Structures are given as structure tokens and as C-alpha cells.
């Protein structure tokens, strides 16, 4: 699923309100496993899992994760 604009789906916002970090909320919304995202990014599963624990990833990291999700980097900024 690719987001053509900067909209953030209600399901993602709801998960964030419930306490999930944006990266995790988006991954779950897109029905991706941590392993799949790690493969798309070319990193290990453990390295990706660590990224989901960072409240505000660096811009370069955010852009890489967004590319793996098929969204824009600023959609991970909430």
C-alpha cells in the first residue's frame, strides 16, 4: 500500500494515541512483520526492532523506514 499524499490513516493515529510509536503503528497498519521491513531495508531483524523503540528517529533513518513502508518520511513524524 502506498500513500500518495501526506495523510495518516485513522488506524495509525489510533494506535499512536493508544501508546504505540509511529514506526510500529505504521508497520502494523501495513500488515508487515519486523522481519519483512528489515529485509526491505537491508538490515538485520534486531537492528530494525531497535528502530521501533526510538521515539524520534533521525531524519535519514526515518526516510529509510518510510521508503520500506512506501510512505513519505514526514508521515512518520507525529
Task: Give the role of each language-model region.
Residues 4-30:
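A short, Lys/Arg-rich alpha-helix, primarily the initiator
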Residues 21-40, 64:
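Short basic helix-loop element that most often maps to the first helix and adjoining turn
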Residues 22, 47-50, 75:
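Residue-level recognition of specific faces of alpha-helices
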Residues 34, 45-46, 73:
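The DNA-contacting recognition helix of HTH DNA-binding domains
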Residues 42-57:
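Recognition helix of helix-turn-helix/homeodomain-like DNA-binding domains
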Residues 59-76:
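DNA major-groove recognition helix of helix-turn-helix/homeodomain DNA-binding modules
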Amino acid at each position: 500500500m502506498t500513500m500518495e499524499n501526506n495523510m495518516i490513516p485513522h488506524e495509525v493515529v489510533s494506535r499512536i494515541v493508544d501508546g504505540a510509536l509511529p514506526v510500529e503503528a505504521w508497520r502494523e497498519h501495513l500488515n508487515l512483520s519486523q522481519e519483512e521491513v528489515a529485509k526491505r531495508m537491508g538490515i538485520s531483524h534486531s537492528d530494525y526492532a531497535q528502530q521501533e523503540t526510538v521515539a524520534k528517529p533521525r531524519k535519514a533513518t526515518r526516510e529509510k523506514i518510510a521508503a520500506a513502508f512506501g510512505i513519505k518520511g514526514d508521515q512518520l513524524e507525529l
